[in-house]
Amino acid sequence: MLGDLFTKPKKRKYATIPSDGTKADVPEGIMTKCPECKKIMYTKELQKNLMVCNYCGFHHPIGAKARIDMLVDEGSFEEIDASLTTANPLGFEDYMDRIEKDKQKSGLNEAIVTGHATIGGNPLVIAVMDSRFRMASMGSVVGEKILRAVEDADKTNKPFVIFTASGGARMQEGMLSLMQMAKTSAAFKRFSNHGGLIITVMTHPTTGGVSASFASLGDYNFAEPGALIGFAGRRVIEQTVREELPEDFQTAEFLLKHGQLDDCISRLDLQNKLSFILSIHVKAPGVGGEVDGE
């Protein structure tokens, strides 16, 4: 009897009960989990809400054409320069393979879509960056499309509205990519000198060379809630200044609080806000002209 106290207990045996196959399979894509509040919702309901979480207001990333569809008047958008695409100017290894993959993934030829449209009946030239394509990095074609769009707005006396979302300059194009910062900024300056209206809307993420050039050169500088906006990464800055940064550093709310944005606008309110601003800045044909400073 005492010996039984020191014997090893027998391992329990477990039987595996086969599944009866009655568990319903949920089709892929029918539900979406919010990365912010972790709530799960129907994807269709999320889409109806312009990809803004019904529970916490988190703004999910959206593609350029989806953003245009939700903003402009139905049937008013006419794309320009859709065929422009990069030619790998530096012969960077496997660059074109990556470009082709992004074309298939996004359905775009480049990381930005530009064109003419109306919002609330107000004409404008619109440009929307798409982070699915090379993280919307700014290469020579992106810079050229922005330049042409701004020049179109100048010629037609229309306001220019641009939605930014970028990881910065495109490293595979080297100096040709970096020069787009000056090229686009100069185009904005010329247009501004001619009396043109520029509205920038910074979305998540707007970083690197884009944030350091044209992204904040608008007459109105807006951002979507929660958008990451900044030049260098948080860890790089902390290691450089040897200080711990605020938790909300480089967010749209932080920039608004420190006077670097005019407003932080929910995607749900953006169409009405833009329509109102455009309506009070309507410029009659032939009105305007250069101002001092060009």
From Swiss-Prot:
Ranges where the CoA carboxyltransferase N-terminal domain occurs: 30-294
GO cellular component terms listed in the entry, alphabetical order: acetyl-CoA carboxylase complex
Biological process annotations from GO: malonyl-CoA biosynthetic process; mycolic acid biosynthetic process
Organism: Listeria monocytogenes serovar 1/2a (strain ATCC BAA-679 / EGD-e)
Domain of life: Bacteria
InterPro entries assigned: AcCoA_carboxyl_beta (IPR034733), Acetyl_CoA_COase_Trfase_b_su (IPR000438), ClpP/crotonase-like_dom_sf (IPR029045), COA_CT_N (IPR011762), Znf-ACC (IPR041010)
Gene: accD
Enzyme Commission no: 2.1.3.15
Complex formation: Acetyl-CoA carboxylase is a heterohexamer composed of biotin carboxyl carrier protein (AccB), biotin carboxylase (AccC) and two subunits each of ACCase subunit alpha (AccA) and ACCase subunit beta (AccD).
Membrane-traversing stretches: none
Keywords on record: ATP-binding, Cytoplasm, Fatty acid biosynthesis, Fatty acid metabolism, Lipid biosynthesis, Lipid metabolism, Metal-binding, Nucleotide-binding, Transferase, Zinc, Zinc-finger
Function field: Component of the acetyl coenzyme A carboxylase (ACC) complex. Biotin carboxylase (BC) catalyzes the carboxylation of biotin on its carrier protein (BCCP) and then the CO(2) group is transferred by the transcarboxylase to acetyl-CoA to form malonyl-CoA.
Catalytic activity, reaction form: N(6)-carboxybiotinyl-L-lysyl-[protein] + acetyl-CoA = N(6)-biotinyl-L-lysyl-[protein] + malonyl-CoA
Listed cofactors: Zn(2+)
UniProt-recorded Gene Ontology molecular function terms: acetyl-CoA carboxylase activity; ATP binding; carboxyl- or carbamoyltransferase activity; zinc ion binding
Residue intervals of every C4-type zinc finger in the record: 34-56
Name of the protein this chain belongs to: Acetyl-coenzyme A carboxylase carboxyl transferase subunit beta
Cofactor note: Binds 1 zinc ion per subunit.
Binding site for Zn(2+): 34, 37, 53, 56
Keyword Lipid biosynthesis: yes
Annotated metabolic or biological route of this protein: Lipid metabolism; malonyl-CoA biosynthesis; malonyl-CoA from acetyl-CoA: step 1/1
Subcellular location: Cytoplasm
